[in-house]
Each structure stands twice: as C-alpha cells, then as structure tokens.
Amino acid sequence: MEQQQSKNNAHVSKLFVCTAVDCKDDIEEKFERSFVTLQMQISGLSDKEMHDMLSQAVCKDKQHEEISIGFLYIMLTDPSMAPKTYRDVTLVSRDGMNGIVTNLTFLVAEKYTKLTEVARRQLIWLLREFVKHQVLSVENVIWNCLRQAGGGDVSSRNLFLIESLLDIFIEFRTWLEGNPFLVQSTVYSFVRLIEDHANPALMSLRQKEVKFTISLIRERFHDIIPLGRDFVRLLQNVARIPEFEQLWRDILFNPKILNQTFNGIWQLLHIRTSRRFLQCRLLPEMERKISFLASSVKFGNQKRYQDWFQEKYFATPESHSLRSDLIRFIINVIHPTNDMLCSDIIPRWAIIGWLISSCTNPIASANAKLSLFYDWLFFDPAKDNIMNIEPGILVMYHSIRNHPFVSSTLLDFLCRITKNFFVKHEDKIRIGVYNSLKLILEKQVIPNLQPLFESPKLDRELRNLIRDNFREFLSPPANLGQLLYPSTHTVQGHILKKESDQRILHCENADLHETGLINISGTVISVVDEDKKISLVPTDQEIESVFSDGTAENLRRVHNIDENTDDDDDLPLSKVRLKEKPRVELADAIAESFESFVSKRNSYTWEAFLKDFRPLPASAFEEFQLNYVISNTVLILRETLPQQNIFSESKTDEKHLAKSISYPLYGLFRFLYENDEKSKKPFQILLSEICERIPEIGYLLLYFMKIYCKLQTRKNSQQSYQFKTTIYRQICDAADEKIANCLLRDLDMLEKENTNIFLWLLPDIYREFKSIATNNTDLLRITLRCIDARNVRDILYSVAQGKLTIFKQDGLIDCIRESLEFETYEQFCLWQIVQAHDVPLRCIQDLLPELEAGSHPEALSHFLLLLKNEEPTNEIIRLMLSREPKSKGDPFVTSALRFWCQRYEEKLSEIIASLLTSKYPSSSPNKRKRPPKGISVSTSIPSADQVLNHLEHYRRSCRHGTGTGLYVHDMMQRALQSAYSHSNDSTKKQFSDLFALAAEEDTTVGRRGGSGRGRKQPGSKKDVNNHGTSKKTAEMVKTIYSSDENSSEEDWSKSKITQTAKRRKKANNDSD
C-alpha cells in the first residue's frame, strides 16, 4: 500500500494538472525530466560553483536545452525562487534565452489548459520580466496567450488572463507599439472580448479595456487599417459604447482625423482580413477540433462529434458569440483540397449549417448569418476567392428540400441585408451580391438558382422579395435547359480554381481584397443614412431545425468531380490540421531529425534534418513518404516566415541583421552556402517544390547572402566570405528557369516588397551578376521607377566611388535606345547615371540621327549639353547633318552649330564645307558620289540636300548678321559654289538665298594660273588682296541677311540674285 501511495505521489506534477486516469505525454515528461536533471546537477552547490558548472554544461546543445527547460520549470512552479532563477538563467544562457522562449511558446500553445493555477500566475510574471528586459521573440508567447484568452468565456480563469495581459500592455505600451502585428492582434482581440463583458459585474474591467483599446486605435490607426473588413464587423458589435460610438462617427464622417491616408469606411471594407487574425480568436484546442471535423470525419458520422463540441464550447449563454468566429474561420481559413472534395468527408456547408441552425440566441443567429454572407457583400471576381462564397449558396441549396426553413431564413436575411446593410451605398452592396451569384453560376457550384429561388416551399412574401432583389436570376439561361432540383442522394459537384498557395497564418497586406459590413450589439444595422442615424434591421426568428444524421446519410455522396478540371493550386489547411493527419513511417536516417524539426520549427533542427536528408538517394523513399516530407517541410517554411517586417529595420545593427535571417528558410540558404557537394534527387525535388510554393525565395536568398557575408566577415576579418552566385544558380535550376529571367523577376518582386532593401542590394547585384545586370534595360527600368532624388544621389555616390557599375561602353547605345520609351523623370535620372560613368560621346553618338525632337526631348537635351563640351569633329558633324530636317528646321542642329561657331567657327566651316564638297566630286561634276556599299545614305552619310537644308535653316536663324562668319571662309564659299553649279533648277530655287552668299563660279577663275578670288596665297598668310576680298564678302553677307528681314525668303527672284552677283564681281575687280 505504501509503495502504491508513493508511486501516486511521484506522479503528481507541479506544472500540470493531472487526474488519476491521465498519462503523461512526451511534453510533460520532457519538462519534468529536465527539472529533475537540473536539480541533481546544482543540488548542494554555491552560486559561484553552480554558475561555473552550468556555463560549461550549456556548451553542449542537448544539455543547454535541458538546463533551459529546467530553469523554466522552476520559474513556473516556485514563485519564491523565480526571481533568483531568472537571474541565473540570464547568466548562463548562450542564446539570449531563445530556447526558453521557444519552449514557453510551445507550452502556452499546446498545454495552457493543463497548467496549474500557480503556473498560470507565474507565466504572467515571467512574461512581464521578458517584456521588461526586451527578450527577443517574446511577442510570440504574448500572441499565443492572446489566443488562450477565449471569446464567449467569462470564467474567472479567463478573466484573469485577459486582465493580466491588459496590464502588461498598458505598462509596456511603448514596447507594444514597436510591434505592428502585435498591435493589430491586440486591438482585434480586445474589440472582440469587450463584446462579452457587458455584465455589470465586469464594468471596471470593460472600462479599462475600452480606454486602452480606443487609445491604441486612435494613436496607431495606420497599423489598424490592415485589419480590414472583419475589424469593422467587430466594431459593429460594440458601437453602443459611447467611446466606440464616437470612433464610428469619426470613421464615417471625419476619417482624416484618424489618419491622413485613411479615406473612410470603404477603404477598410475593401481589405480582406488576414487569416491569422481570424485564427487568433479561436482557442488552439478549438481550432484543432473544428479542423479535425472538417478534414477527417465522414459525412453521416459527425453527430457525436457535434454533440461533444456543443457541450464543450456552447454550454453557457455567452458562448453563442463564438459561432460567428467559427464561421468566419471555416469560410476563410479551411479551404479543402481536391482530394477532400472527392472524398466523403463532411463538407464545410454542412458544418456551417449545423452552427447556424443549432443557435438558440436570436442576436447570435443574426451575427452568424452575417458572417456567412459577409464576403458576398463586396465580392469582386477579379480579386476575391470563390471559396469564400461557396458555403453560403450550398447550405441554402442543399437545405431547400428537407429543411426549407433553413433556406428560407437565409434567403430572407440575404435579401434584407443587401438593401439595408449600408443604405447610402446600396448600389455597391447589390453589385457585390450580384457578382457572387453570377460567378457561382459560371463555375457551376450549383447547376442553377431556380430550384432555390422559385421553390414552392417558400412563402409568397419571400418569393416577392426574391423577385424584387434578384430579378435577373429568375429566368433560366437558354443553355441551362430544364430546371434541376437537388436530389436527396446526389448533388452536382464542382472543382473550383482556388487561390494560389498563400501564407495561411500570416498577414497578407500586399494582397488586399474587397468585402462588406456590419453588426452591432447583436443586431444587424445599416451604417448611416442622411440624418447620420443608425437604423436597425429586425432580426430573424430562432431557428429550430437541426441537421440530422438521416439527412447527412442521404447526402453522403456529395461531390462528383470533373477529372479534366485543373485545380492544382488548392489552398491547404492550416498547420494544426496537418497535426491530425496520420504519421508516415520514414527512413531511420531522417525520422528523428524530421520529427524534431516538425515539433520545434527552428533553423537548427531544420539544418540538422537537411544534413540527414541530402545524401539519401531516391531508393530510400516511397513516393508517398517523399510527398509527406516535402508537403510538411514546405508548409512549415512558409508559416515560420514573419508576416511583417521580413527585412531588418537596421542595415548596420548586427542583432537586427542576425534576427532577420534566423528563420528556417534562411537555414536552407545557410546549408547550401556551407555545403557545395552535389545533391541527390530527393533533395532536388524538395528544392524545386520550395521554389514553386515560396515565390519569394529568390530575393530572400539574395538578401541572406548580403547579410550573411557581412556578419561573417565582421566576426572573422581574416577570412573573406564571398557572395556565392552558384547558390542562386541552384535555385534557378530547381525552378527550371534561366538565371537572367529569375533575377529580373526576383528583383521586381523585391522592389515592390521593399524599395530600400532593393537599392541596398543593388551594388551587389551589379557586381556579382555583372554579365546579366550590366546594360540590362529591364533591370534599369525597375531601378528607375522606384528612385527619388535622394536615391539618385546615393547611386551617383556609389558610381563615383567605384562601388557600382551599371553601364559598360560596349552595348550601351542599345540600352539607351530602348530607354527612349521610359517616363521623362526616369530618363532624366538615367542620363545623370550615364554621365556619372564618364561615358565618352563616341559610344553613343550614333544615336544622333535617330532622335526626334517631338518624341525624345530628354535625350536631345542631354546630347546638347554633351556637345557643348566637345569640339566639332568630322564624325559628329556627319551624324548631326544626317538628321532628317523638318520644314521648320532642326533646333537641335541649329543650337549646336550656333554655340560651336562662337569658339570653333573656322574649323566648323571647313568640316561642313568638306562634307558638302564631297557630294560633288570634280571628276564627275554632273553625278553625285555614291556612298560605300552597305552604308545607308539617309542614316550614315548625309545627302547634299540634308546638308543644304541644315545650312539654310542655320542661315535663317542668323538674324542681324550674328553667326554669319560660318559662310565667309574660303572652303565654305567654294563648297556653296560647287553645290550651286551641280544643282538642278529646283534645288537652286529652293536654296537661292543660301547660294546668294557665294560668288558665281566664273568669278572665281582669274588670269593668274587659276588663283581664285579670295583664296589664300601659299606664301603669304596676310595677303592684302585676300583681306580685302574677305572684308567685301563679309559685308555682302551682312547685306544679304539685313535685307532678308524685309523680303520673303520664298519669293527670291532671279533678278535679285543676278544683281547681287554683279555687285560681288565689281568688288572683286576693284580689289584686283
């Protein structure tokens, strides 16, 4: 007897509440074993001896975990020793108490309901210490504690937890506001909990909750906006409280007072609430049970599970409010796969039908119906998921024959809520409901609506109401043929294209969708009318019918699946549902490490599993085993990524940087970085699946390598850590894509996710992926679209310091040619970066003939500035004069010639004259020289007409004799004479004013051995005759330009040309 008594005493746990029939599970044994081991090690030792011994012991991973759990056990079970133990653990912990926080998080999530009263109170004390000392990841413990603060529960135990968490949040408000996701979870949870605390005995707690919540909402409203439509639904239930009533008025009528970026209630209603917030309002145990019901219970066998659930969670009057939370969770989180749709598992609509029909509280019943149809009210087929509206139509469709009262009340509610939900914007609500019904018919969720809308089991008033609201759906479409009523044995099945695999337990602020509105104090309301009053909609009658086993048996064969329908992107259930799946026996080599990873979900266990998994050949797995491993690992990798702030807030602080790459996915990158050997096929399959299901993996890898190399180099300055592009190539190979395509896609996604991190990584990208990134127009466009003036400045600094090279000379012209279609601001930024690279003009000058004044003003502006710093050369002038002249001239060419004339007049005149003369060779005066084979006259070499056109437009710009010196030089004179003599009558007439600047050809031939008028003599540079001739010519040119203002350029007469020529001839004779 004594032995039996001692055995029973030994079984009693200080941490967990155990009955005589309870057996210890692995978690309980692990905690108590660690406590006993720690006691044996430190028993009888002084503080100094204990610290020395433990400091050596914690160097081993296994002992470190045991010691951490042992200390945690003491702090949770012994209030008197807790402060000293906390000091001890801070001295010996080598991971910043990460092990303790991880185990405490798991303990709260899995075993909170079994903790003793002392342990619960010590948990609050320990949380307060963690928050006070800023222990990393304590927000995970807080979030799991918030989940344990259940709705619909006013027991003293639950109220103690709620008030304790509230006190921590109030005391450490600054710490709370530093974590936006925790702010969102806290506000969402307390707005929901305040609804349950209407009892006068709880008035002091309720007032404290209201004061804190309202203050947090108003001060951090920019963090509250992502809570979206379901936050509005919760606000509706507390709108009668004065503080919330004033908040409602500000949201509706003065939104800018809350936040300058907030545009009103519709902005919230267009945002889909993250699944994680919907999840946080269910107890973890309740979530596991409802997920098990929806994934493992066969249709027809569910009654005993429903009865147990009803007795467990709906036993008190306050618990009815839980039904709305459950329905929103089922609709938005539990999206069954195709395999489940094909099976005889109980469908979602049947569970929701049971939750609504078994509700005996009219207020909770109205709220439950609103939860069912909530996503209908603002449904947008282009954005929203049909799986969120499917249960509503199916529960009505399948109930119409045997439970018409269920269908009738739901139809009546849908008709009334469409009209009265938001009176001011009834048209928009109606569009959302119409979109829902239209997509339901298109996707064949049900064959047609006539069996439901025109059922003889509906009363006349309801049929009239349906006719008024859904007239468009009453006439059957021609292609549907005869009306089909749902059978009691089989119904039309469907496969729907669901959302791509999204992060189930994380915020989805980048993927926001539309929905609908509200519920207050248990009564459905219309938000506002013109008098700013809240109008009430009468609630429905209590529903008495329930879903019986008989009906379920008749409807057991529910889904007939079209095998040709593509539905590979089904959204999996949440992680808790995976725990309910039967375990698969795995090879001994990975069984232990895989189980450790699944339970702990950290980088250390993940890398240990990878080390065991990588060398295994394909023969080590059956197909189902490999699929089991891959599906679980991919899901865990996604779920353990942070929902917000995935990147470090600081680019210099080592703690922030290290924390940002501490998640299991980064463990994969670290493993690949440190292990270069070739992988076996199973590992390659795993890598491919990760790449497919986690699209962000590419840019997260780039981010990891930047930080990892930075941190490792700081730790060991003797060794250089390289940015290994081979790892990125592995990822690209696993995704079966070219590295260039992957890089551009990943950088595009990264820029949209976080512009600062994208620009931070940019120098590394251009350095490590030089062959792909340099002169890459697509990457350049991604960069230019996101930068502002400060970013341009930083890029220029990096280029000037040699840290960043965006362009190389070879091929640059093609890059700039493609950039001509960019936006104006982007092009101006581009030209600044080009200029910072000191690109010589010769590399891009071939673009000059292609640029058009109307289409490419940015490029022409920059080219003009470049030309001002260049001397005119034969090549540049050739390209400029190859530009196609317009009827009104080319201001670009004219501007360039004008400023060159100020410094290089003679040189410019000689170059143009030489170019013009080359068109009229002396050997063939009547034929123009043909261009070399393969060179286009119009683009490479300017034609004579192009040169003359540009000279003519330049002449017109030279008013009052300014800039006319270009034409007085000897070579230009001879070139114009040659052009005149070789031109036809049409050309001579067109350029008559230009040709008038040169003497006629016969005046240039004298009797002194062909020495022409005005030519320089070989032996005398300052010949008097030449000086006189130049002076006379200059005066003549000035006379021509002066007379040009008073005469029409188009009406030059032949007689005027002759008179001018005679005056020039007389002047020449006088000079001779």
Curated annotation (Swiss-Prot):
Subunit structure: Belongs to the multiprotein complex Integrator, at least composed of IntS1, IntS2, IntS3, IntS4, omd/IntS5, IntS6, defl/IntS7, IntS8, IntS9, IntS10, IntS11, IntS12, asun/IntS13, IntS14 and IntS15. The core complex associates with protein phosphatase 2A subunits mts/PP2A and Pp2A-29B, to form the Integrator-PP2A (INTAC) complex.
Region (Disordered): 920-941, 1002-1072
Domain of life: Eukaryota
Keywords, in A-Z order: Cytoplasm, Nucleus, Phosphoprotein
Subcellular location: Nucleus; Cytoplasm
Sites of Phosphoserine modification: 1042-1043, 1047-1048
Nucleus is among the record's keywords: yes
Assigned protein family: Belongs to the Integrator subunit 3 family.
Protein name (record): Integrator complex subunit 3 homolog
Function of the molecule: Component of the integrator complex, a multiprotein complex that terminates RNA polymerase II (Pol II) transcription in the promoter-proximal region of genes. The integrator complex provides a quality checkpoint during transcription elongation by driving premature transcription termination of transcripts that are unfavorably configured for transcriptional elongation: the complex terminates transcription by (1) catalyzing dephosphorylation of the C-terminal domain (CTD) of Pol II subunit Polr2A/Rbp1 and Spt5, and (2) degrading the exiting nascent RNA transcript via endonuclease activity.
InterPro entries linked to this entry: HEAT_Ints3_C, INTS3, INTS3_N
One CC-aspect GO term: cytoplasm
